[in-house]
Amino acid sequence: EAIERELPSFLRSYFVYLKGNVLPMSRLAYLQDVRFFFDYLISNTSLTDADVPKDIKLEEIRDITSMDVNLFIDFCRKYTVDDGDKLIIYENNNKTLARKKSSVSVMFKQLYRDGFVDNNITDGFDPIKVPKPGEREIKALQDDEVMVMLDAVTTGSNMTPHERKYWEKTKLRDKAILMLFLTYGLRLSELQQLNISSFNFSRGEFTIYRKRGKESSMPINQSVQMTIQDYINNERSSINEETEVDEDALFLSLQGRRMTSRSIRELVKKYTAI
């Protein structure tokens, strides 16, 4: 919240979006990246007359182009900071650059959705290649990779037209799976066995079915609860109307059947590879 006070007030809905859609461990990194972007605008461009990020005007943001953001990402590859006594050189790999791009992309997409800017300039952002996981494993994720993955499942970024067409039908389900996977570290079998009845939203908890039939109760945080309820109310319910379904299973295929552990594994692998 301290960083939020250092940024312009027109980003208020962006802050709200982050609280509702991004894991707490990643939200701070988003805000730090956006603040760094604004510091860059002040110190390295003529795009603003402000002396501090908070004073940057919405009119100045409206004039920013995709080329300006691409130049910022290129700047982030290697830059020098004067700390008073010495010059410090910073270098970032493609994974970190992809995270910074994701942070700025989400900000501009939110400004566009709010009607604060006329164009969605993120379509013109240059792609950044990042190493993909091996064919069989689900890799451990760093914070910056988590951010890229959650941005992809939330906005459909970095997808092929075919992937995006399928994502439109399952984006709320996919996000709910990833939020549970990332927040609680659930096994694929535990995700697969979750039911709607596993969740007691009024008490703020849910039940996990462990090996050998053991059950464990877990507290559910606000971001995860909102994501799951959004999926149940707005996406899963439409599947229920179109075909016979496993009525209590939480995660359904488009055919209305409980997803298998294998299909959940492939889903997680797909998003870790984006």
Regions found by a protein language model. Give the residues of each.
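Conserved catalytic core of the tyrosine transesterase superfamily
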Residues: 1-274
